[in-house]
């Protein structure tokens, strides 16, 4: 974006939810989810998560901060269930660059859809779809719906190019080749009014920080650290930077690997303080290596939450894994006002304030995979702050305990436990005499 300094930013989002998208982005860092449907009381909704770590949301946010016009150019297609792709870890872009990354994954797109898309490119009629938006009689499969969207986006871009000199397009890589094809062959696009009818149901929902991991693509801790990082680069700060090299050095200084290290280190300090167990440097080194190997085995460059928890559990214990879970999934921003209804999120869907379950479908495809079950012992939680203290007070007359003595006994038991483990380890040491041949 800072290389182009565009006159307008065009993004791959439906243009009949533009007002809601801009309003939700203005709420950041509070999280929002925009749900929309074609019935007034939907049981299923398409949704757009306002994810601060998403490139589309970030580009809109930068545009708003720098007074650059924003255009949402995508077509809203009913009952759209896009095919999902398990793309390579996008951390690779930091190492090989965006151009090489796109070249590599575009080979997969061509292999999967080339023949079918080539047959349908000139058969799917956008004009018929736009004329019959309220009552669409023809059924379209996912490939046909994608071609409708790509035609619509190309038509929208051609109109923008007649108005603006520099147009910055933020779009999914899977769509770029077809959008480019229609822009190079405008005669393939039917001449039609590009206005979309409004959805019957569009609503901005508030999402609590505790549910952040269900809508964010990154670990919530990563997203939080990114928000803190971007605070350092206000409009005035960016304008004071004198050379492009200085700008790119600053922008590229955010390091996800360093944030993963901080998650594990902060969890270590909390664990040691609460459980009085020491996690030594050798264990930490093994933990870093183990989580890295797990991620590589899953064909990822950086570990995800599952990898971090499995590593923590196996190298230290369940209690430490819970500390890692708390640090990795913590998103500290919560909107305490009642300006927006709050959805209670889960992996499969959401519950509105009345308790009604709503099935959610993401506007952009994204593979979560089913949440792998992490074999952690369930951690008890208070139903309300101070519950356990109240329960203790209720039964204090029947409890024989004296805290100074308890502390001495617990420390002694901890000492015996560690001493026993050390002795058992020593018994397993075997020394062989070195003999030369």
List where the protein language model places each region.
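Compositional signal for N-terminal targeting/processing segments
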Residues: 1-437
